[in-house]
Amino acid sequence: MAQVQYQGTGRRKNSVARVRLVPGTGKITMNGKPAEEYIPFANIREDMVQPFGVTETKGQYDVFVNVNGGGFSGQAGATRHGIARALLEVDPDFRGVLKSTGLLTRDARMKERKKPGLKKARKASQFSKR
């Protein structure tokens, strides 16, 4: 018998997360490691599981995430986006709740590129009038 699973892809900054939801106890595995080990910051982990709280499905699904690119924050954001999309597969009625909380929206903010002649994207050397 094939195991029921739901998939979703999330993106944030330079990170891409491929998320699989499997009915279970609520443990999260990221790139083969537990989420507590993979992302050391509790506040970022809490943001990551926000879709479960909004849809009241906390502890009902095990989450398997394959994520690459970016840092902790981007990867957690991509995972959150992927979980929200996977929950849509679980029940299309979740769309209204997820959309109103902004969890289905791809956060388009990216790092601004460095410009030639400047030290960073906007940081210039000190201006001297004379």
Swiss-Prot record:
GO molecular function: RNA binding; structural constituent of ribosome
CC annotations in GO: cytosolic small ribosomal subunit
Keyword 4Fe-4S: no
UniProt cross-references to Pfam families, sorted A to Z: Ribosomal_S9 (PF00380)
Start and end residues of each stretch annotated as Disordered: 107-130
BP-aspect Gene Ontology terms: translation
Disulfide bonds: none
Compositional bias of kind Basic residues: 111-130
Keywords, comma-separated and alphabetical: Ribonucleoprotein, Ribosomal protein
InterPro entries: Ribosomal_Su5_D2-typ_SF, Ribosomal_uS9, Ribosomal_uS9_bac/plastid, Ribosomal_uS9_CS, Ribsml_uS5_D2-typ_fold_subgr
Similarity comment: family membership: Belongs to the universal ribosomal protein uS9 family.
PANTHER family for the chain: RIBOSOMAL PROTEIN S9, SMALL RIBOSOMAL SUBUNIT PROTEIN US9M
Protein name per UniProt: Small ribosomal subunit protein uS9
